[in-house]
């Protein structure tokens, strides 16, 4: 016999029974619906199955050597059993934990359910109270109206006759229903109507469920039903109506932050009002604006008050309040190194003096032997004192650099050459030091020269109110020689003494703040700023904002070129990690987040842009026309400036602004820091300008573009060479000066009329010489009546080039014939002389 004997064959069918019913809808539509009845298969375990499974999973069975899998030792079996026991314990713990969590969740759900029920119960009671109150008021009002109406009718109408009530009774009897007879059972039609009414009620009740039942599908009823959502909406509307009957929702009063200018749409959003309503309110005030236009703060405040809100004035400058302005406590202040700025006239030996102190040679690396950058160095003296030195340029073009050096310094060392005395930049340095209110030490340099006269220096300083100690003043003065090292120790001692008197202290634990001494765009490192830390400690990773730029400190490099992790007060460092090149003189502040730094930088950039737009905008049409007319009369020399550092670029721009007069001027189209790029060439080509590179070069693409577009690129490393060349180029735009030289006079003796030529004057040259190419003026009674040129000059019948004094000749004027005997002809020549800018 086969194993399959007595068993039915397997198949996919028979799992469920199906049939079709037809569902009817309104308007004669039908739909066939498939109805399935699924059968469930119940599996009953065989007797003894549970016992065998228990036996199989028992440890004794696993530990039985006879039934143990082959190749498993006792130790391995013990480990497996321990793992099983640990797993069972974990399962028990997990089950307990899940049960506890479920219990807590159930308690939380129960608590929330009770709170919700209590809230709903309070709302129902409140709604019921409001509804009852409204009904009582309405009933009282109706009763009062009915009583008043009856009293009014009683006053107007006479008492009715008793017989008048008879027809009313008859009418009431006639209007009574006649279908039902008292005491008789209902008829068949009445029973059918009652059944229809019950069926309709049941049908309406089932429509709330929103589901199609099998009975409805078979009976064809309940085709188009009302949705459950519609019923919920109606119930919610009725509930809200009952709760808010006779009460208007209270308007929420908001505090609206109001900047200096705001767009109408944004104002509406902050008030949570419709923009159309705000526009309508502004139109009532006489302002025809759209929702995308801006309005001023005063107008917006009136609108806010009209809508019942409160205006809170805020300024765009509030974003800068996040900058830390902590007042340092006395116990947190620690001594810091003094900052000494070396200032003086060009070539008076400032950098050489600093080289002698540092025992280095910086001046040999400067172009032209003059300092064109501001340098910051730290020097440790033999006594162990640390001094921070700032070396400033002495050239006249670097006024702003010297001013920046004086603003951040503690002590100014004024270097004056003993053989040159006080010069213009020396006077300027004195003014900067006095404006910054910092003490001054005079270093009389080049004392080793034979023609040195230190007393002349001291006497010249008296004219500028600088009185040294040797002349009974309070300003220290030291005679030094940077070449031989004479007097350097005394100078350092005086600096240390002055620093002790100042008692310089700072808090190194606060957020860092410093001043940008110099900034540049390095090819390999990007924007780099030389920062002198004034307060706090600047660390790697700090987020900072400086002027219109922001960044994160990627690296700190000290004056020796070494990378450091932090820089304390009075320490100069190069900061890497800026998103752009800042302006020299900007203040660096450390902030908490990158978002704050970006927001402050964006605000400062917008403020600077608005300031430039306001400065360049003409207020009236007359001013605009006058400016255009003035510009038309002035010749311009456009240039594009690129420099290695920000301070040099500023100095070049300031120097070029002074070049020119009322006829010609230099126009700087753009100045920046870094190499000359293709963008600079495109700008210069569009404006017919020259590109000037100061200690920078053009990249390959820029050089190629310059050759293609015929744009001139000039390179310089010394600023006064640059200024001299630009001055020469601007001088070429000046109109040449015309000078007249009188070469002779002739008197008209007689006038002849010649056919084809016109009037010809027979003249006698009384003085000088008469030339054919010269200009002439006709004088009558010493009054000039004509100025022009000669058409012909003849002696006898020959055309000649010139006629000497005392000889007679014939002259005819070009396009002029009103000549008379006795008139005087003045003969002159014009010469054009090139002009130069002073």
UniProtKB/Swiss-Prot annotation:
GTP binds at residues 344-351, 391-395, 445-448. Residues 481-483 are annotated as: G5. Residues 50-60, 162-177 have a biased composition (Low complexity). Residues 445-448 are annotated as: G4. One of the essential components for the initiation of protein synthesis. Protects formylmethionyl-tRNA from spontaneous hydrolysis and promotes its binding to the 30S ribosomal subunits. Also involved in the hydrolysis of GTP during the formation of the 70S ribosomal complex. GO terms for cellular component: cytosol. GO terms for molecular function: GTP binding; GTPase activity; translation initiation factor activity. It is found in: Cytoplasm. The keyword GTP-binding applies. Residues 18-27 have a biased composition (Polar residues). Residues 88-156, 187-208 have a biased composition (Basic and acidic residues). Pfam families: EF-G_D2 (PF22042), GTP_EFTU (PF00009), IF-2 (PF11987), IF2_assoc (PF08364), IF2_N (PF04760). Residues 344-351 are annotated as: G1. Belongs to the TRAFAC class translation factor GTPase superfamily. Classic translation factor GTPase family. IF-2 subfamily. This is Translation initiation factor IF-2. Keywords: Cytoplasm, GTP-binding, Initiation factor, Nucleotide-binding, Protein biosynthesis. It comes from the Bacteria. It comes from Cereibacter sphaeroides (strain ATCC 17025 / ATH 2.4.3). The gene is infB. Its main location: cytoplasm. Residues 391-394 are annotated as: G3. Residues 369-373 are annotated as: G2. Residues 1-235 are annotated as: Disordered. Residues 335-509 form the tr-type G domain.
